[in-house]
């Protein structure tokens, strides 16, 4: 199973939630191999796994960015010369074991670390995705880059977690397209509500402002390539208050978010998992 943490807004506690979820899952499932893929160029999740502020997490992360980058940026760099066909690579060359840097992390967790260079690669990746080649769906070939990476691993991991950047850039689309399930954290504010509404539109093409956008949407392109969209697994109300329960000041916003979700569940039940 492949889970992606994402929302179209920063500051929702997504990376903290990802870290806590992944580490707890690995502790409770010692017999399973867990892979973390950090698709956020800020690489905050990777830094946490590699030691955080007090454990030289930043220095450990920077040590991965040598000539042979052991990161998602290193993998993307090796895909740029071969964007539309899967090259002969060893996926394990890009993966590290964070336990070697941070003994507090379970040794059944591996990570494809985040990399700031991904931001620099974005224009090249987007250009390749929009290249016109006879007989080749260049967009889906590029969107499949992480899916290709996972296939190369050939079932080595029972569960995979992806941490995504809040933007809906090409690398975020690459991440989301590879997931089975989405976990969307929200906070008790109107911007989180708008971000959730944006997520429904960006990923699933729901409530587009105009039909003009529909044929070019992420959902339409994936469906055209006979690819399944991930389903929404959880919408996590994160950081509501430092006290027990929900802060009454934010109750109206939370009720609005609940109503938005209920409306979409009623009109598009197929985009939700409804299961553990």
Regions found by a protein language model. Name each.
Residues 1-276:
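P-loop NTP-binding core
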């Amino acid at each position: 199973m492949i889970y992606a943490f994402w929302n179209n807004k920063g500051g929702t506690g997504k990376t903290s939630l990802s870290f806590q979820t992944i580490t707890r899952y690995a502790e409770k499932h010692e017999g399973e191999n867990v892979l973390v893929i950090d698709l956020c160029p800020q690489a905050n999740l990777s830094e946490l796994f590699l030691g955080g502020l007090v454990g030289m997490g930043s220095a450990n992360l920077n040590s991965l960015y040598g000539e042979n980058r052991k990161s998602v940026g290193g993998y993307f760099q090796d895909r740029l010369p071969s964007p539309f066909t899967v090259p002969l690579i060893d996926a394990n060359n890009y993966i590290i074991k964070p336990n070697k840097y941070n003994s507090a992390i379970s040794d059944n967790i591996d990570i494809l670390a985040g990399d700031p260079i991904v931001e620099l690669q974005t224009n090249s990746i987007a250009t390749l995705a929009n290249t016109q080649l006879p007989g080749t769906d260049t967009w889906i070939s590029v969107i499949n880059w992480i899916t290709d990476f996972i296939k190369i691993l050939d079932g080595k991991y029972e569960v995979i977690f992806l941490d995504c950047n809040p933007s809906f850039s090409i690398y975020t689309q690459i991440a989301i397209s590879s997931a089975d399930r989405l976990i969307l954290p929200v906070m008790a504010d109107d911007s989180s509500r708008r971000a959730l509404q944006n997520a429904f539109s960006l990923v699933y093409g729901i409530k587009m402002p105009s039909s003009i956008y529909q044929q070019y949407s992420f959902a339409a392109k994936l469906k055209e390539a006979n690819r399944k969209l991930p389903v929404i697994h959880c919408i996590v109300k994160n950081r509501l208050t430092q006290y027990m329960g929900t802060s009454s000041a934010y109750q109206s916003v939370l009720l609005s978010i609940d109503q938005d979700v209920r409306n979409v569940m009623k009109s598009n039940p197929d985009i939700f998992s409804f299961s553990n």
